[in-house]
Amino acid sequence: MKESYDYIIIGGGSAGSVLGGRLSEDVSNNVLVLEAGRSDYPWDLLIQMPAALMYPAGNKLYDWIYETTPEPHMDGRKVGHARGKVLGGSSSINGMIYQRGNPMDYEKWAKPEGMESWDYAHCLPYFKRLETTFGSKKGDPYRGHHGPIKLRRGPADNPLFQAFFDAGVEAGYNKTPDVNGFRQEGFGPFDSQVHNGRRVSASRAYLHPAMKRKNLEVQTRAFVTKLNFEGNKVTGVTFKKNGKEHTESAKEVILSGGAINSPQLLQLSGIGDSEHLRSLGIEPRIHLPGVGENFEDHLEVYVQHACKQPVSMQPSLNKLKMPFIGLQWILGRKGAAASNHFEGGGFVRSNDDVDYPNLMFHFLPIAVRYDGTKAPAAHGYQVHVGPMYSNSRGHLKIKSKDPFEKPEFVFNYLSTEEDKREWVEAIKVARNILKQKALDPFNGGEISPGPEVQTDEEIIEWVKRDGETALHPSCSCRMGPASDEMSVVDPETFKVHGMENLRVVDASVMPRTTNGNIHSPVLMMAERASDIIRGKKPLDPQYIDFYRHGVHDKDAGTVK
């Protein structure tokens, strides 16, 4: 350990890995990354093998194993939340799906005063900088070709994928060649963070290549218990490792703990709602009532069907076949274990009142829940679906001064009439697609939710019972100008309002969640933050057209 550091990054997850790699490019910067979890060992099949994605969740070796407090609008159910407690964070245990979100997400980010530089034109260059997109042509102006994150375009060669895409067309939608390109709306193959049959986590892409630098130090199993201050100036951190307490000083501390851990540590440090902090015996340093508020997530369900033809991946769940599948991967990074199997899906609008897709479909040629529970069918397939920009909001609060006590949080799923209406639309749209002629040769009947779920009320009751998190918690320390009393972080600097030498860079600072998986936007924000922190000239905005419903021809950018 050094006497002091230029930057201490709390959290070696998605954003922390980007920052550790980028900030240490400047040899004059001494950088320390502190990760509470274990290392992402190269021999660890459960995180390196793409098809093993269901196993780390719920395993204390990799997962914080959070759950909500009883959700008041889901009959008091507690909803489990897997969050990566390992180097790479949730990028080491997630589904490896790469979705930027819709360009209109960023246009919305940029609408409030003070947020103008977060429009799509300013974000696109940073998306491109982080990507190497093997599924796009070199001259594609929407995609990157030289970045650390290597992206595999899903081959989607199982016949069920093509039948699903065709069913989408028969239901009145379109096919799109690249949901991260000109046109998101429609059905087609997805990009995944898989390269040469291995998971591409943020730590593998950014941190590990940089660890040979003498100015970068990465400590795992290092649990940060508090921030250290002189007045409102952060001077360093205290953390525990191997039962011993350590204190390190730094010119700047960057909090990249994620949407749960970042607001937790801020509140423990006296940064949050003053009344709540005083009730726990914590002296407030600054009153920022937005810390832990505006909490967003995506809820999803599985619509599952039995498959009449023996073409699904269902047999790969047979435990007798798993050793052979694993051996194929170990020897050649090939076979069923070399894919995350989320190789295609789509984005659609559930009604004409929304400007851009509010539903996302992940299609799988297998019927299995995220926890590994398989459907009672020899062969099956499913779609994951749910509203993507729900107006339900939750909150997170610490329960005591103890940094090791998990905070309590709730998302208030299904708490608004709009949310419930879009859930009914989501299931009806999914069922309409899955009953089309293109799927007739395979359709062996609906397994879940099943024929007993038909009315709007029955659909909502089923979602209450069966809905799961899509694992996209965000917005709990949202950025915005200081004039917005519920904002926490300055949008131009990532600095916490009213504090010195303290920044937050992770999913918590998103002003609103995007309409897809959030890992890609987090990487983009961290790339951008790295330039801001280093004082580098930002990348020039790229003003380029993108598909807008009602502006472009409805078939613009589609695949015929």
Curated annotation (Swiss-Prot):
Family annotation (Gene3D superfamilies): FAD/NAD(P)-binding domain, Glucose Oxidase, domain 3
Active-site residues, record numbering mapped to chain: 472 (proton acceptor)
Domain of life: Bacteria
InterPro entries (UniProt xref): BetA (IPR011533), FAD/NAD-bd_sf (IPR036188), GMC_OxRdtase (IPR012132), GMC_OxRdtase_N (IPR000172), GMC_OxRtase_C (IPR007867)
GO molecular function annotations of the record: betaine-aldehyde dehydrogenase (NAD+) activity; choline dehydrogenase activity; flavin adenine dinucleotide binding
Pathway participation: Amine and polyamine biosynthesis; betaine biosynthesis via choline pathway; betaine aldehyde from choline (cytochrome c reductase route): step 1/1
This protein's record includes keyword NAD: yes
Record field: catalytic activity: choline + A = betaine aldehyde + AH2; betaine aldehyde + NAD(+) + H2O = glycine betaine + NADH + 2 H(+)
Residues the record lists as binding FAD: 6-35
Reported cofactor(s): FAD
Record's GO cellular component terms: membrane
Record bears the keyword NAD: yes
Keywords: FAD, Flavoprotein, NAD, Oxidoreductase
Gene Ontology BP term (one): glycine betaine biosynthetic process from choline
Enzyme class: oxidoreductase
Function, as annotated: Involved in the biosynthesis of the osmoprotectant glycine betaine. Catalyzes the oxidation of choline to betaine aldehyde and betaine aldehyde to glycine betaine at the same rate.
Protein name: Oxygen-dependent choline dehydrogenase
Gene that encodes the chain: betA
